[in-house]
Amino acid sequence: MKRRFTLLLSLAFIFAASFAGNVDENTARRVATAFLHSRMPDAHMVAPELPEALPAIHIGSERTLMYAFNFEKGGYVLVSATDAAIPVLGYSFDGIFTFDNQPPALSAWLTGYELQLSDIMDRNLAATPEISASWKSLTDYQPGETAQRDLRSVEPLLPSTWDQGSRYNALCPVDGAGPGGHVYAGCVATAMSQVIYYWRYPLQGTGSHGYYSDYGYLFVDFSQAGYDYDQMRNAIGPESNYEMAEIQYHCGVAVDMMYAPDGSGAYSFDAASALREHFGYSNQLSLQQKDNYSQTGWADLLMQNLDNGWPLYYNGFGSGGHAFNVDGYQGTDYFHFNWGWSGSYNGYFYLNNLNPGGNNFTYGQGAIVNFYPGSNYPYYCNGVKTLGRHNGTIEDGSGPVENYTAGLNCGWLIAPSDSVTNLTLTFEKFNLTDGLDVLNVYDGPDASYPLLASLTGTALPQAIKATGDRLFLEFLTEGDAGSGFRLSYNSDLAVFCSGTTIYSDFSGVISDGSGTRDYNNNSVCKFRVEPENANSITFTFNYLDTEPDYDQVKIYNLASQSLVASFSGNEIPESVTVPSGKAMVLFNTNNDITAGGWELSYVSEATTVGVAAAVNSGGLGVQVYPVPASDWLRVELSSRLPADVLVSLVDLSGRVVVNNIRAGFTGQETVLIPVSDLAEGIYYLKYAAENSVGTHKVLISR
């Protein structure tokens, strides 16, 4: 009976394989939830029950070819719409799947899946026993099963989620039609630079290279370029980062990037040679094509590299030239793709034919293997390095694969050049020999300041926050058995100006607020100048230093709602007068280059006002002479009522050079102001009483 049962089961299996059909949404949902749960690492396991899937997204232009299921707590799974193909095409434990802003490489990869699935459906192919078994194991899955979670795997190696768009492309050719006003950096450059950042190698390039592009002749002397990885970040954030833009641009020039505002392209074989010739990577580095390997042989090649801690540059389906990174795997079929699209859609994807009997739509795949540094690596740390950016990353110097050495005594001073708050260290990796090797963190610029933490062992430390704007890190080793540490340092830029500030004085000084530091990116600051009873306002720049054309200081006439003038660059312009008593200064910056900022002075003209126009109703009369004045300035005041009057002489910068108070006078009063020691030029006499205010322009000349 036992043998008969086995035979019947086998026949049923063959029958099922012979009549493979479409998969309905409910079955696909059950498969998606089971698969995600079965592959979920312990770090993502928040509960033993199956995750909750949201409504399916149907993929396919004329018919459903696959389903995409997003999950309430993050992650997504792509499921075949035919059970003649392998059940799961791709998955991620984070993020969501939509059709919005998909990386071009992902779109091309999904097109490859669609071609395969259409071929399988059109030819009515049967599922293999292995494919049928995969579907059955997922439809019958129970949450307590853990076998699939024990699969051979390598967690994603790359800490970065870089991009080829805005800010990453800041040094690429200028083109207003491209992201951030520049052409795309290119997926080839991004895939190269993410692995370069992973190794933090080289510190300096080799040789030089130039070529003629659609944007003129582009040239880089790599031998004069220094790459400062400690001032790069895992993701660029809202501010520009010269170091991150530099490495992408240099990779682009090295491969003769065909720059364009809607997408930049290059050849993968150029990437391989450039990495060896200009960036010093191993002579064993090479571009391999999937078509030259068996399915198993290709998977083994990729896994061998990843097991060694060597991420891969990968190019995908067809002739589109799409490049990205493969940096991990689960099992022998699913490899982790970092698309180079700010982390969007990163996940595990199936590499091979979805049905062995189908046509081959996986052509064009290739990988740069043995992508590891030359023989002069690792560098290890030495001395004390000062870091001037307000955010970045620090690694002990041994790299992601090797251990550090004994006898190290090195440090990092985090001293941002900008005004910052909330300076914080966040650890991503930590492995030191307990009690033998130590990382000390001091709350200030050197080891004489209070010790915030003395770290050793393998437990990942909690975040460490400075009380001020400086941190000093000291790394001391006696052993060589640890793999070291990697951390990010981050801080918040001080707010120099924001919102709207109102100025009601007759004269004053307005600035971007940054003082001796550079202003911030993405600033929008408004300054309303509305002195009481003013009929004109004159603005004079004391200094001006902004990114030309992009970071602008604009002056508006609020009475007419019109733009009077706009300024940028570093040349001091002529004074500008707004012919009304209401003006606004607007400072607006983009997200790229910053500079020293600006300061301007304003002085307003006003008419005398009182309780009534006549002197006998309590008004204040003012006469000023001689004009021009050389040694003395005579101010005649008159009032029928007791008056306290403040008389001030103000220069064009808004600085008060003379103050004179006449208290409680009635009738006539003369104020003599000595001006012989003052420089020649225009000044403003400002006077104010309880019911009367005004200014007179005064010329001092000799």
Give each language-model segment a name.
Residues 473-481, 585-594:
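Short beta-strand-plus-loop segments that form exposed binding edges in beta-rich domains
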Residues 23-54, 59-61, 77, 84-163, ...:
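Cys-His-centered catalytic/binding microenvironment captured across papain-like cysteine peptidases
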Residues 88-89, 94-264, 330:
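Active-site-adjacent structural segments surrounding the nucleophilic cysteine of cysteine proteases
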